C-alpha cells in the first residue's frame, strides 16, 4: 500500500535530502527518489541490495543498522518504515544518531489497521467468536515508543495519517480465508463463517460501491542529540570524523 504524499513529505522534512533508508523492499526507496531525494539503502539481504542498486539515486550498503559502515554526520534524514522493531535498538539507535548530521532526524513509520470504524469492529467481533486472537495484529509499532524514549533523540514529533484501501466482497472473503483461524476450522465451520462475513459486507456497503478498509500511518520524527554519544561527533570544516 502506497504512503500518502503528504506523509512522505512530512517524514522527509526537507526537499532533496541526502538520506539513509533501512530498506525492507523497493517501495520506500522508489517513492523517496521519485520525490527527488538521494539515498543510501541499508540492507543485509544481498538479493535486495542488488535490486536496490538498479534504482537511480540509490547506493546500497550491505550491513545492518547496528553497525553502519559510514562516517559520522553523513545524512540529513534516516528512514525506517515498518521495520524498526526488527533491529537491536540498543545498538542501532546510537549508530543512527552517529551518522545523522546535527539537526537531522530519524523518521520512522508504521502502517496499522484502524479498528475504530464500525464495520471493522463488527468483523473483529465476528472472527473472535472463532478465534479470540483474530485481528490482533502485532505490527511492531511499539518500537516507536522505544525511539521516543531514547536519549540519542531528545525531541520527538508524532503524527498520524489516515489511509483507506478499497476492498470488494470477494477481497474480504479472501482476506478472511487467509487468516490463521481459517486453517483450524472444519469445512462446515469455515463455510458458515464466510456466509456471515458476506452478510456483514452486504449490510455495510452502499449499492454499487465497495467498502474501504481503514489504516493509520503512525509517523515519528526524532531529532538527533549528539551530546549523548560516548564519542562526541565533531565534524570539522574539511572532513567528518569522530575524535576518540
What are these regions, as identified by a protein language model?
Residues 1-18, 25-27:
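Conserved alpha-helix/loop element of class I SAM-dependent methyltransferases that forms part
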